[in-house]
Amino acid sequence: CLALLAIAAFPALPALAADAPALLLAQVYRPGLPLQDYWVSEKYDGVRGFWDGRTLRTRGGETVRAPAWFTAGWPEVPMDGELWAGRGRFSHAQSTTRQQQPGDVAWRQIRFMVFDLPGDKGTFDQRLPALNALVESLGQPWVQAVPQRRVANDAALQALLHRTVRAGGEGLMLHRGASLYRAGRSDDLIKLKTHEDTEARVIAHLPGKGRHA
């Protein structure tokens, strides 16, 4: 019938990943947060990467087809981080991590910025030295532990934010030191930017026209 022909004329949308990893997600910063409880780091504008001990995946659960050398020697320990190409280079990180046939030239510009160990049962205060030791033991320049610091008050936090943004960074992340790794959004992880945007989930990539196609 005509209805069936009409449906068949359009390709099916790609299925959403059914095995999205259970990740810790960030809430938006609000004034009055007890800053003495938090570690602060740069918010890297890249693609969320989750190493489950065998496979590198995105936040949505899609497999990242990195070159074999990129993950060679990685531990069976899960690592949570950001696949990052540098400040102001989100488009390169995004296009590279989507490649079905990974290219060495593009991937040589990607770093895995590790900010947590989801499988560790300790608090973030306890996970942090374990994370730093693990990354150091790998000895791979493209795998780096995200530097963490403390700030004394809101004025110091805002000053750090503006220095980071002026240098080309996206913003800051605040991680509660006493928190366990729990999936979902909570005040355990906070994001702070000079402006906040609304998150949207991509369900399909369709061909288009124009300079952004």
Residue map of PLM features:
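Nucleic-acid 5′ end/cap handling module spanning
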Residues: 26-59, 143-213
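Hydrophobic alpha-helical segments with strong N-terminal bias
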Residues: 1-2, 30, 100, 159
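Bacterial N-terminal signal peptides
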Residues: 2-12
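Covalent nucleotidyltransferase
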Residues: 18, 30-141
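Short secondary-structure transition/capping segments
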Residues: 1, 18, 127-130, 187-196
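Sec/Tat signal peptide C-region and signal peptidase I cleavage site
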Residues: 13-17
